[in-house]
Amino acid sequence: MLDLKFIRENPDAVREAIRVKNVALDLDDLLQRDRDLVALKQRVEAMQTERNANAKLVPKASPEDRPGLIQKGKDLSEDLKALEPQLREQEDALKQLLLRVPNIPLPGVPVGKDEDDNVELRREGELPGFDFTPLDQVEILEKQGWADFERVARVSGSRSYLLKGDAALLEMAVLMFALDFLSQRGFTPLSTTALVRRETLVNSGHFPGDEESVYKLEGDELLLAGTAEVPINSLYAGEQLSADELPLTFAGFSAAFRREAGSAGRDVRGLIRVHEFRKVEQYVLCRADQEEGLKWFERLLSNAEGLLQALELPYRVIQNCTGDMGAGKVLMYDIETWVPSEQKYRETHSCSYLGDWQARRTGLRYRDEHGKLLYAHTLNNTGIASPRILVPLLENHQQADGTVRVPAALRPYLGGREVLGQPVR
């Protein structure tokens, strides 16, 4: 959410953000509704002033004038009461439009329509040079008996998965490694819920706009979040912190759920795109200072790259264009990790800086050293999302006999084992 005063004073900048982010919003309609609401509030305030002035006249009025003044007060009160529903309706309508206003991208963000217009910044790590025909993720899992996609589909339908044996241990290992890695870098580990209220998804910016991707529990006013960012973002909703309490840095672990409503037919096979997964999410609350925010952005990015380097996985860093960065973000980078069977990089991490856009929605402010109340800035980035990360892990580290080499960083979490599986080819 942007400051309404900023929108009034900078309509061209907001209109351009709406255009380059492909947001369906009529800014002229919003501004007209704002003017109408201001006029209605002024009318209400004038009537309240008149009613208060009239009330002061009643005790001093003559017996002849008093009944008329009393009646006038009643009439004004009734008129004000009649305006209350109209005032609430106009306030709610304006708020719903304000929730759709996108943030202003930082200078230098490439303008584009979708992911095809994203810009590659760099590549890291060497691509594997196999001297054998490599298997894909599903072939590795099935040959080792590490997954049962057929049976779990009877339980949960498509886009579900069941890991067994070493693959299940590998998933736990990589998640624990990510939590330890981030904890050692000063991030507080959180084990948080995926069950959230609707306003929590509004606070994070997923609503309005992403309703089709979210599971809702029938009979309850609860939904299933797709990332720990959602509940963490609302932990301090409505609170006032002091400047010395910031920054707050978290490594949030949670189950995550996504309906993948817009992904029909894409990545149905295997572990890339599933409805339920586990995720470690980096989340930062910092002061309302863009320079500080950008430093945290680089740190979150460095953490994600450090995790992938420790896992010995080749990857590339992408700068997202305006049309592929989401409404609330001023800057966004994706990290894509190499998947040998597809001969391409696949997204595994998204690093985002949102300025005060989320904090305005949650009402989270802090008092600076001068006593001024400011909205905090928020950032987030994936730590590890599983089982997706298992795809490049299994494929890049497979060996000629069908076993999988364990990266050194994960061996302490797997009893010191250097290889998973049995020779199957």
From Swiss-Prot:
Catalyzes the attachment of serine to tRNA(Ser). Is also able to aminoacylate tRNA(Sec) with serine, to form the misacylated tRNA L-seryl-tRNA(Sec), which will be further converted into selenocysteinyl-tRNA(Sec). The keyword Manganese does not apply. L-serine binds at residues 227-229, 281, 382. SUPFAM superfamilies: Class II aaRS and biotin synthetases, tRNA-binding arm. The keyword Nucleotide-binding applies. ATP binds at residues 258-260, 274, 347-350. It catalyses: tRNA(Ser) + L-serine + ATP = L-seryl-tRNA(Ser) + AMP + diphosphate + H(+); tRNA(Sec) + L-serine + ATP = L-seryl-tRNA(Sec) + AMP + diphosphate + H(+). Pathway: Aminoacyl-tRNA biosynthesis; selenocysteinyl-tRNA(Sec) biosynthesis; L-seryl-tRNA(Sec) from L-serine and tRNA(Sec): step 1/1. It is found in: Cytoplasm. It is an enzyme of class 6 (ligase). Its EC number is 6.1.1.11. InterPro entries: aa-tRNA-synt_IIb, aa-tRNA-synth_II, aa-tRNA-synth_II/BPL/LPL, Ser-tRNA-ligase_type_1, Ser-tRNA-synth_1_N, SerRS_1_N_sf, SerRS_core, tRNA-bd_arm. This is Serine--tRNA ligase. GO terms for cellular component: cytoplasm. Pfam families: Seryl_tRNA_N, tRNA-synt_2b. One of its GO terms (molecular function) is serine-tRNA ligase activity. Homodimer. The tRNA molecule binds across the dimer. Its main location: cytoplasm.
